[in-house]
Amino acid sequence: MKALVLAGGTGTRLRPITHTSAKQLVPVANKPVLFYGLEAIRAAGIIDVGIVVGDTADEIVAAVGDGSRFGLKVSYIPQSKPLGLAHCVLISRDFLGEDDFIMYLGDNFVVGVVEDSVREFRAARPDAHLMLTRVPEPRSFGVAELSDSGQVLGLEEKPAHPKSDLALVGVYLFSPAIHEAVAAITPSWRGELEITDAVQWLIDAGRDVRSTVISGYWKDTGNVTDMLEVNRLVLETTEPRCDGLVDERSDLIGRVLVEEGAEVRNSRVMGPTVIGAGTRVTNSYVGPFTSLAEDCVVEDSEVEFSIVLRGASISGVRRIEASLIGRHVQVTSAPEVPHANRLVLGDHSRAQISS
């Protein structure tokens, strides 16, 4: 069995961060979202992985390499522009061959899904197996309609009047039958080859399409709110450890991870929080639910429930919360600040905030 990981797309909902970085590499608890998926695929016993890449191919390749760090063998499949999930399957035909495969959206975050779904698929080997989850607003997702026995009757892509609240999670399992389906469908009104249309083709052809309503956690990390929520969830599992320097005037409270080379001076850090390697925190309050990446500087400031990327600097800011701050951003004080500041700043930005 192989894996097809989709790491193209433009990440418009995470702009300006994704103007200069692949959305799949935005870190959660200081580790790129994509890496969690690759680790889950390896844990399921799959080694051969094809990664579909687009405009950010160089960045993805630099981060993942040949996959050996994950125990994987990685191949890269270029997609000239986003033309739909089914198009990703179409252009990956040579890599996939006649093998069964799992298709995994690289910007999704799932817990307790991949291993179980692969095991279930291998045991029953239907033509397609879909992972579903109940959502409060199904009109924003691909939605499945099921029979009383759980058989998939039909799929709709972002329907105006959904027939269920069961949304498609970004994990699909297919037999080689899917290749006939993606070759048979035509582009949707969006000009894309939709995977929902390909699966519907299998259903209409009388093929065996099954589903599982997952009990594990799932988030599409395509927007800031969901990124912060996933960061919170992962930080909840953080084991406290201090490999850096914390002076006697500082307090680490709860699950705080201070990585090697980090310094905390005259500050209070409330867990769960991660302080990245080489980061300096001085005269500040950080956390809870905060990730500071490597080589950041936080001084005379408060940062809570936020993700701060590599090399960012925050100085003299009374309070930042619920924020995603890009690489090498500089945030400094300026007159007349509100009590809290909510920011989404792209890489290499400069912002002035009053103290």
UniProtKB/Swiss-Prot annotation:
Molecular function as annotated in GO: glucose-1-phosphate thymidylyltransferase activity; metal ion binding
Binding site for Mg(2+): 107, 220
Native organism: Streptomyces griseus
GO terms classed as biological process: streptomycin biosynthetic process
Keyword Phosphoprotein in annotation: no
Keywords carried by this UniProt record: Antibiotic biosynthesis, Magnesium, Metal-binding, Nucleotidyltransferase, Streptomycin biosynthesis, Transferase
Catalysis: reaction(s): dTTP + alpha-D-glucose 1-phosphate + H(+) = dTDP-alpha-D-glucose + diphosphate
Pathway: Antibiotic biosynthesis; streptomycin biosynthesis
Names of the cofactor(s): Mg(2+)
Family: Belongs to the glucose-1-phosphate thymidylyltransferase family.
Annotated PANTHER family: GLUCOSE-1-PHOSPHATE THYMIDYLTRANSFERASE, THYMIDYLYLTRANSFERASE
Enzyme class, UniProt record, top EC level: transferase
Protein name: Glucose-1-phosphate thymidylyltransferase
Stated role: Involved in the biosynthesis of the streptose moiety of streptomycin. Catalyzes the formation of dTDP-glucose, from dTTP and glucose 1-phosphate, as well as its pyrophosphorolysis.
Keyword Transferase: yes
UniProt-listed Enzyme Commission number(s): 2.7.7.24
Cofactor annotation comment: Binds 1 Mg(2+) ion per subunit.
